[in-house]
């Protein structure tokens, strides 16, 4: 990575924007950054890390200048690989108004290689990741590679023992293979040991699980399933019998319900006939009603029209009188408009001209008045401005004096940076002292805590062991009891076989009783049905006679009625359609009574319905007799099929024997279940106790191991604590102070006062600039005011001249100067009055003529409508008489009496239709139900017996099914546990293998042997590279090697390649050797990156070197730079500054003037 350009604003001591051009700075390969202590030299390096990684290398969070609320950095750099790429990173930070902390506002990285700029990433986190991806180094690696900090050159060369190993671990980033890996490994081993203990506890829970137990349970399950299948068949048979009985019982109840409904319907017949007649008359009346309504409506409209015609004729007379009066008024108004109006219009025009002139005059007077006021105001304002200018000059002198006093105060408050650094070092040591003390105390407390935990675990382990032995003893006792119980238990098949015999005997006795009862009931039904059938047939014969007589009467009356209708329709001269005669005699014939005919028809309809009902009853009785006869035959056959064997054995003695066996089996099952539950409960408790025991055993071992480790750490902590305490006392003696914090507080107070003073100077300078600007503005305004005053006075004279001219002109036109608007309004009022009078009369005349014309048209229209209505009245009467005759109403009143609306008619018809439908449905339902019943019959006692038998069979099947489910669950659980046991054994084997590997690793990484091995190999490569550089710098005089223990050995080629210890080197020799080693180390760290770093900074304290040694160092530095590597030196020494071909001078911040500034100098 090659830097191109850096811009800084608001970072540490840099307040205003400063730009550093690295292309010019690195042109000669060697350059220096110079400036006094605290000027901001290192801040330039911070700006690069802040741009690339979003933070400074010194890990400070308060890096924004105190006088700024925003911070901007941008860094342009180049990557020189196969293809040269250029990038620009820009970041902006803001200060939080509430907390005062610095927060990132924006960040972006762009590719500026070509003509088109491409934004690669935006946002702080994304930009951080992109920069690390491009360069290939983290922040820590970058700072170790680019900068060699002060005081670190010779440290790496001379360190030995633990400090050397720790430094190597940090430099090569091997922490993850040292303590971190050891801690991870210890945690992993502890975790796996815990898993092993838990696994051992879990395996204890599978002691009674094996293939023999599984086989035994499967045999029991098979035996129980066979019993269950037999019981299921018996239950299915009982279920079929129950379903058939349920159907028959339901059908019997439904037939009884339908017969009751049919009887209720027959009682409502007369009421329904009356409703049917009312509906028929209502429909006829509804047909006549529209004609009646039309006729009555026509009469009403005729009366209304007559009244309207009379009203309009009276209105016509009044309008005629009003028209004559308005014609006279219109004539007078027209005369005024044509003669007087033109004169008034001329006068109005002259007055308007005068008013315009008067308005111009008034405006000019107002302008004059405004100018007079403005002249007075300008005079006063000019005087005030001159006074302000004098006051402003006094303020400027006062502010200048205050700034000079504050600058003197700031100089007195400055504290040397070296002193401040040593105080900071003391505070850091004090903080470290507190941390070491806390760590030491914590280790002591942890050691005590683990000792208590160890004692607790040991005590609990012993208690759990005793408890476990007790539980195992109980488990053995219960297991023996269960084995003894299984030996004495009778087999299940004995009870089941006896139960089958008992059930068979019960069923036969029940069926025998049922068949006898059904046989008796069927015989009774046949006898009753035959008696009813005889009665019904006698009633049917009588009903047939009645129907025959009524039919004869109806035929006679209908014949007479037809002859009467024919006679009525015949006209004189027309041929009779029956006899052909043209002479018709109508007198002497008696009119047929239609009401009597309707009564006979209604009576016949009733007889017909009754006959139909009686027929249905006879058919049902005959069907019932046939069904019962078949049932009697079937019952006799069923009784014979039962046989005589079941009567030989007493049902009561069989039931007693069965109950005894059943009680014995139930007692055994209860005891066995209780023992199984006790054994299961004890096994689970034993397993839990075993797991707890193993857990406490592990805790005891871990606590014991941890106590040993903590004691070792405590000894190390005490040693480190004593070292820090000694260092603090030495530093206090050197600085001759007792309290670092109090001294730092004093320094910070001085800094705070200095910052406040600087802020005050800044405010005063700003105010001084404002006062200078105000003075210039006031002088400029005062000059402009005087010019405007002169201009306004000349304008005032011109206004006086124009006013006099306008007054003379108005008097010539009108004669007066005042009251012009009143005169104008008076003339306008007269003109308006004449015009309004004429317009009003003309408008009223038009309105009267419109009213007269409309009234005349309405009278003509009403007469025409009256004539049409009279014609319609005659037509409506004819139609009404015709429909009354067709619907057989004597007059309008009769039709109105029988009128019903559609809703009432529909309601009556609906009731009739509903009745007929219900009767038809009931008859049909009875017929369908009889067919479904198929002559079957069921008594209530028999139905109850069927239900009880079904419940008993179901209960037996359910009990056997539940036992099967329980046994299946046990088999399934044993199978699952066998699989789990297999997995646990496999896991145990894998865990033992893993623990073996972890133990080997623990031995390998013990005492950081692996870290030393890796670091030593890295160090050998670095020493080879460092030896080459050292030979180049020293002209082949010295070389560098590493022995088997990782210690650096110097080869002195001036003395035949003799080996020398690093401690024997002089100051200059140590410096050049350390420099060569540091450069090689930097290259090694760079190998991790994806881009070569072409810049190297030495932030080294050269002040301790004498002139000869400094010459050697500078010669060395001039040799190591090249085209691909630029070397920068950060220093404040003038001797080094004179040797540098390119120099970047950093000027420190000045209170009240601005922040640090940079300047490039080239020799």
Curated annotation (Swiss-Prot):
It comes from the Bacteria. GO terms for molecular function: ATP binding; ATP hydrolysis activity; endonuclease activity; exonuclease activity. Keywords: ATP-binding, Coiled coil, DNA recombination, DNA replication, Endonuclease, Exonuclease, Hydrolase, Nuclease, Nucleotide-binding. GO terms for biological process: DNA recombination; DNA replication; double-strand break repair. Residues 197-415, 446-1003 form a coiled coil. ATP binds at residues 35-42. InterPro entries: P-loop_NTPase, Rad50/SbcC_AAA. Transmembrane segments: none annotated. It holds the Pfam family SbcC_Walker_B. Belongs to the SMC family. SbcC subfamily. SbcCD cleaves DNA hairpin structures. These structures can inhibit DNA replication and are intermediates in certain DNA recombination reactions. The complex acts as a 3'->5' double strand exonuclease that can open hairpins. It also has a 5' single-strand endonuclease activity. Heterodimer of SbcC and SbcD. This is Nuclease SbcCD subunit C.
